[in-house]
From Swiss-Prot:
DNA-binding region: 21-40
Protein name from the UniProt record: Uncharacterized HTH-type transcriptional regulator PF1231
Domain of life: Archaea
Entries under PROSITE patterns matching the protein: HTH_ASNC_2 (PS50956)
Domain HTH asnC-type, first and last residues per copy: 2-63
GO terms of molecular function: sequence-specific DNA binding
Organism of origin: Pyrococcus furiosus (strain ATCC 43587 / DSM 3638 / JCM 8422 / Vc1)
């Protein structure tokens, strides 16, 4: 379980993942080794999944960000979700309740690539009954799971 110090360390890392342990330690008034040990423990326990740059795909040469709802044959949802999660174009994927079984966000460079993804990749996965694709025309917030 996370204590208040862990939560404060996470807060500062979420604000700027490049912030040094020594800077966080100085702000929090604890030794640098304390921050280092706690971050290492949170990585080991999967609380921190990884450190990565959060990019704007539109500025990085990608023109299409789409949300795809997927309907799957009964009893194949987990199997299909695992196969979809392996595809490079998939940024976020989750099994859902409600009208559709799976939702995913994909990023591709063009409409042609989106078509290839839908027909050549999704079309070959056994168990998918149907998909519904929505292309985002603009994005107002890029984020991450802010928990603190």
């Amino acid at each position: 379980m996370l204590d208040e110090l862990d939560k404060r360390i996470l807060y500062f890392l979420q604000e700027d993942g490049r912030r040094s342990y020594s800077e966080i330690a100085r702000i929090l008034g604890v030794p640098e080794s304390t921050v280092r040990v706690r971050v290492k423990k949170m990585l080991k326990n999967g609380i921190i999944r990884k450190f990565a740059a959060l990019i704007n795909p539109f500025k990085a040469g990608y023109e299409i960000v789409a949300v795809i709802a997927v309907d799957v044959e009964p009893n194949k949802v987990r199997e299909v979700a695992e196969k979809l999660a392996e595809l490079n174009e998939v940024d976020v994927l989750g099994i859902a309740t409600g009208a559709h079984d799976i939702f995913m966000q994909v990023t591709v460079k063009s409409l042609r690539e989106l078509e290839e993804f839908l027909l050549d990749k999704l079309g070959k996965i056994e168990g998918i009954k149907s998909t519904e694709t929505s292309i985002l025309t603009s994005v107002k917030k890029w984020g991450y799971a802010r928990v603190f």
